[in-house]
C-alpha cells in the first residue's frame, strides 16, 4: 500500500463490500464506500471504523465519474450488483445495474488510469459445464439465469475495454461466500444456519452436495489484492477455495454450538459445478490463505452471538 492509494468500493453495504471496506480501513487505507442503499447494518456488523459512504445509483455513469474525481480515487473494487431475487421482479433495471453499471465503471476508469477489480460469479456456469472435475479457469460457461448471463456479459465488456481502451481489470468469480453479513441470495443458507445456531435454534440448510465455501473476509482480501496487482489485459479468475460437503458444514456448526440440530436437504442440489480451479488466481496473486472451515464457522457464530447480546 502507498500513501496515495484511495479506494472506492461499490456495493459497500453488501457482505463482500462491507468486509472489503472494513479490511481496508483496518490497514489504514483511505476508502470510500458507494451504494444505492442506506442500510449499513452489514458494515456495522463487521467494523467499528467510520467509513465515508456515498449514496448513488451505479446506472448514472456521469455522477459516478464525478465521484472518482471528487475523491481522488486510484483503485476501484466494483461489487455493486443485484442478485437473482432482486432481478426477477424487474429484469430491465437489473440488467441496467449489473451490465450497465459495470460499463460505467470501466468507462470512468479509462481516462483516469484506474485499474478495476470487479465481481463476476460462478453463476456464469451451469450443470452443462460440469465435467466431473474442477472447471478450468478458461472454460466457457453456459449460464441459465439472468444473474449468470449478466456476469458473463460483464466479463466480455471488460475484455472490450482492454482491447479498445486499454483499461486493465481483474474479475473474480466467487461461489458460495459465507460469514457475518451474508444474509441475502440463493446461496446464503449456510450462513443462515450459523445465525440460527447463534440464536440457539435448529436449521435445515436448503441444499446439499459438495461445493466450494469461501469465507467472506478471505474473499474481500482477494478483491483488495486484485485491485493492487499490476496487470495488463482483462483477466478473469475462479475464486477457488476448499471443497466441502454441506453435511461437513452442518457438523462444523453443531461442533461450535452443541445441542442445536443442523440438517441438510440432500435432495436439492444447486445447478452448478461443485468445484472450480483456483490455481491460476493463486498464482497470479502470489498465494491465497484460506481460513479453515471450523475456524470460519466459529468466528461467524461468535460474531453473530455478540450482535444478539
Task: Describe each model-derived feature in a short phrase.
Residues 7-27:
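N-terminal Rossmann NAD(P)H-binding glycine-rich loop of SDR-like oxidoreductase domains
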Residues 201, 206-209, 213-309:
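C-terminal substrate-binding subdomain of Rossmann-fold SDR/epimerase-dehydratase oxidoreductases
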Amino acid at each position: 500500500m502507498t500513501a496515495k492509494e484511495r479506494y472506492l468500493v461499490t456495493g459497500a453495504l453488501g457482505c463482500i463490500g462491507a468486509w472489503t471496506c472494513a479490511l481496508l480501513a483496518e490497514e489504514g487505507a483511505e476508502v470510500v464506500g458507494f451504494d444505492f442503499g442506506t442500510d449499513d447494518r452489514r458494515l456495522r456488523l463487521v467494523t467499528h471504523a467510520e467509513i465515508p459512504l456515498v449514496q448513488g445509483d451505479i446506472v448514472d455513469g456521469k455522477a459516478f465519474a464525478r465521484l472518482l474525481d471528487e475523491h481522488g480515487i486510484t483503485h476501484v473494487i466494483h461489487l455493486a450488483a443485484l442478485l437473482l431475487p432482486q432481478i426477477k421482479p424487474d429484469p430491465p433495471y437489473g440488467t441496467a445495474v449489473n451490465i450497465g453499471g459495470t460499463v460505467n465503471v470501466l468507462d470512468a476508469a479509462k481516462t483516469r488510469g484506474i485499474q478495476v477489480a470487479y465481481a463476476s460469479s460462478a453463476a456464469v456456469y451451469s450443470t452443462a459445464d460440469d465435467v466431473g472435475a474442477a472447471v478450468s479457469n478458461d472454460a466457457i460457461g453456459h449460464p441459465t439465469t439472468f444473474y449468470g448471463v449478466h456476469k458473463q456479459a460483464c466479463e466480455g465488456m471488460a475484455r472490450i475495454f482492454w482491447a479498445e481502451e486499454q483499461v486493465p481489470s481483474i474479475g473474480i468469480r466467487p461461489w458460495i461466500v459465507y460469514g457475518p453479513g451474508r444474509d441475502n441470495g440463493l446461496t446464503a443458507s449456510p450462513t443462515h444456519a450459523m445465525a440460527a445456531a447463534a440464536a440457539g435454534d435448529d436449521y435445515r440448510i436448503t441444499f446439499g452436495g459438495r461445493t466450494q465455501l469461501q469465507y467472506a473476509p478471505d474473499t474481500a482480501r482477494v478483491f483488495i489484492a486484485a485491485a493492487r496487482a499490476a496487470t495488463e489485459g482483462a483477466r478473469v479468475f475462479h475464486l477457488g477455495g476448499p471443497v466441502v460437503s454441506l453435511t461437513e458444514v452442518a457438523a462444523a456448526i453443531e461442533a461450535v454450538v452443541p445441542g442445536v440440530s443442523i440438517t441438510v436437504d440432500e435432495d436439492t442440489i444447486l445447478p452448478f459445478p461443485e468445484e472450480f480451479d483456483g490455481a491460476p488466481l493463486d498464482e497470479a496473486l502470489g498465494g491465497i490463505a484460506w481460513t479453515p472451515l471450523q475456524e470460519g464457522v466459529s468466528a461467524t457464530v461468535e460474531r453473530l452471538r455478540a450482535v444478539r447480546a
